[in-house]
Amino acid sequence: MLRTTRLWTTRMPTVSKLFLRNSSGNALNKNKLPFLYSSQGPQAVRYTSQHEWIAVHQDKTAFVGITKYATDALGDATYVELPEVGTEIAQGESLGSIESVKSASEIYQPADGTVEEINTNLEENPGVVNEDPMGDGWLVKMKLGEGVNVEQVEGLMSLEQYEKTLVHDD
């Protein structure tokens, strides 16, 4: 029995690879505002190679945040800087930044749009980004730019595509 156990454990993937393959951590939290904003849930959820996510609803309202993978790499958030409501931000431009005990990281806009609301809860409690990055830790609510179709925006990935990039990064 002991020998069988040893053989079994040597075949197990590392913890990080096992987590990435099972990866419910990078999926949108279905019990929180970014999902519940509309009764049907988001029309599309997409990810960037810089570890941001965007959840787009039927009315072209979108929520933007960072992934669980990003928060794990960043460490405990101590400060979140976000743009003012009404700010127009083009895809790839800085949306703000998150400072942590380890470093500071820029957050980039996944698609053209105008900021409609910021998550003011993060001003007093930036750790929510770590606790629930795919739900209560959303950063901004925005209106997509005219003619933007998130499914056709270059560089955005499905959850499956995004997680494949994470496995290759390790």
UniProtKB/Swiss-Prot annotation:
This chain belongs to the protein called Glycine cleavage system H protein, mitochondrial
Q: Which GO terms describe its molecular function?
A: lipoic acid binding
Q: How does it assemble?
A: Component of the glycine decarboxylase complex (GDC), which is composed of four proteins: P, T, L and H.
Enumerate the UniProt keywords alphabetically.
Answer: Lipoyl, Mitochondrion, Transit peptide
Homology family = Belongs to the GcvH family.
PROSITE patterns in the record: BIOTINYL_LIPOYL, LIPOYL
Cofactor(s) needed by this chain: (R)-lipoate
Q: Where can this protein be found?
A: Mitochondrion
Induction description = Induced by glycine and repressed by the C1 metabolic end products.
Residue ranges of every copy of the Lipoyl-binding domain listed in the record = 61-143
Q: Please give the biological process terms from Gene Ontology that the record holds.
A: glycine catabolic process; glycine decarboxylation via glycine cleavage system; one-carbon metabolic process
Listed Gene3D superfamilies: 2.40.50.100
Q: What is a single Pfam family found in this protein's UniProt entry?
A: GCV_H
Protein's job: The glycine cleavage system (glycine decarboxylase complex) catalyzes the degradation of glycine. The H protein shuttles the methylamine group of glycine from the P protein to the T protein.
